[in-house]
């Protein structure tokens, strides 16, 4: 990740990647150590200006470093266009967000695969805490592409870099299909759940969290939705607006 200064401007991750890392699989000791070094609370910093210099040291920031737009047969890179200010002691990790066009569904070809891999490897080369995150919501027909992509990323990332992948909450409930996903951390997003919202919230309240083996390590929640009564070793928090101290206080445990 880009080195962080006392008040640093984080800009785009761009360019191609040359060398690749060692072969590794999910759950390696090195990757587990990298994840263990992350704070238990991570704020998602989306594509907008963010000043998080007030953030307590026990929290970190997962910031969108770049977006790869998949349109038809093309992969269009959109580097981060807004500043992010953090303190030097704040743990940060880069997120590569994948935006698959609804109007022109992506072909999910080799060039698009390669473009995503290039951005993830570029993020890993600049990483401080050795964790990178892929944010890619796929349709059922696109699942084989995601499985192959994540497997390729895990093979090509250095063994000491952990791979975190976001997941729809339904993938960790009745529509569980991610057991073979070669990620070191899976983050089920328990917000924006549409028609599954009521059922999944009931399930989480009854079980105390997701119980599927790959879905217990982390949980994604949002500031503008009802509190999710569920445990998770690490919590990622999304805000639809720029973060401030009031929003931070709102998401603290009662």
Regions found by a protein language model. Give the residues of each.
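Secreted glycan hydrolases and related glycan-binding modules that recognize and/or cleave
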Residues: 1-254
């Amino acid at each position: 990740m880009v080195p962080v200064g006392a008040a640093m401007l984080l800009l785009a991750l761009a360019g191609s990647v040359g060398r690749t890392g060692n072969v590794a699989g999910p759950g390696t000791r090195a990757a587990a150590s990298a994840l263990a070094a992350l704070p238990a609370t991570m704020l998602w910093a989306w594509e907008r200006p963010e000043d998080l210099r007030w953030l307590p040291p026990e929290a970190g920031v997962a910031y969108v470093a770049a977006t790869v737009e998949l349109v038809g047969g093309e992969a269009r890179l959109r580097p981060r266009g807004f500043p992010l200010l953090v303190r030097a002691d704040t743990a940060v990790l880069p997120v590569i967000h994948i935006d698959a066009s609804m109007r022109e569904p992506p072909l999910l070809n080799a060039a698009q695969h390669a473009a995503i891999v290039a951005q993830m490897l570029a993020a890993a080369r600049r990483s401080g805490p050795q964790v990178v995150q892929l944010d890619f919501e796929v349709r059922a027909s696109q699942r084989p592409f995601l499985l192959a992509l994540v497997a390729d990323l895990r093979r090509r990332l250095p063994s000491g870099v952990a791979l975190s992948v976001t997941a729809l909450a339904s993938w960790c409930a009745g529509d569980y299909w991610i057991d073979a996903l070669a990620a070191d951390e899976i983050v089920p997003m328990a917000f924006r759940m549409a028609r599954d919202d009521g059922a999944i919230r009931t399930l989480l309240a009854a079980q105390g969290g997701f119980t599927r083996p790959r879905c217990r390590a982390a949980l994604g929640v949002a500031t503008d939705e009802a509190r999710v009564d569920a445990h998770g070793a690490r919590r990622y928090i999304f805000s639809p607006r720029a973060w401030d101290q009031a929003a931070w206080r709102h998401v603290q445990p009662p």
